[in-house]
Each structure stands twice: as structure tokens, then as C-alpha cells.
């Protein structure tokens, strides 16, 4: 294994944090320009597109999302000593690490930082399958040597479609132990 791509969702309940942020944006910025959070698409990519369309160039909803994440992330996510130890062990073995998020990238950067992973995560990409492919290319490892860590069915399908191996988050420690130390 030469590279690991961590799904943001494998790091914790980021969907709950994102939903809370969208509800906050609708309450706060919806007073400036009406926004019905319940009318937004169910999937995160759809929500991002709808929010961009709604805001246009008039409203900085992404800035408000960043502020919400920074203020509320401790209520939703806690750093994991086990995860951090596994990632350090992988890095010590020369494995390159990236993080893939459904988006937006600004939020993923806050998640990675809050969980204490900033030094170990070399690259972050947000979006669908194209983001995973971009991230795998940026990490420079062949598909056969790249593992996507996730538990989400849709993300497992994306990884399989790109020829990438997959692992569940609780298997990360085992992967670190199995990876050979570079000579």
C-alpha cells in the first residue's frame, strides 16, 4: 500500500454537522434572501449546488458555513487517538495520506484540522468520483496500491469503479501493522 484516501465520513458524523450548518445558514442568511432548507436536495452535492445558485454573488454562504464549522465542530467530532496513531504508523511506513470529502473543501479542511490530522494529510479533494480520481493521482500511487477508507455504500462503489481497494475505518490500525516499512 502506497496511499490511503480517508473519506471525511469515515472520520465521524460530518453529515450531521453539515446538516446543522445548512439549517443555520437558512435561519441566518435566509432573512437576507429567502431560503427554505427543507426544499434543498437531500444529497450533499445537490445542496451545495442549490446553495451556490441561491446565493449567486450576493451572499457568502460558504464563509458563514466555515464560521459555523469552526464554532460548532467540537460538539460533533472528537479527535481519535487510535486513528491518529494508525495514520502516524502509516506515514512512518511511507504511505501518503489524503482526505476525500463530499464537500465543500473548506469544511473538510476544518474537519481535518480539528481532528489533529493536518500534518499527516497531504491533500484534500471535495466532490464525487472525479475528486477521488484527482486525489489518487495527486498522491502518486497506482490504483492497486491505493486504499479508500470508508463505510458508506456510495463511496465504496465509487472506489470500486476506480479500481481502488477499500477498508472500513476500524481496519486502519491493521492496515498500518501490515504495511512494510520502507528500506
Predicted regions and their residues:
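Short, contiguous strand/loop micro-motifs
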Residues: 9, 73-74, 95, 142-144
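Short, acidic loop-to-helix structural element flanking the phosphoryl-transfer center
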Residues: 59, 70-99, 105-109, 129-133
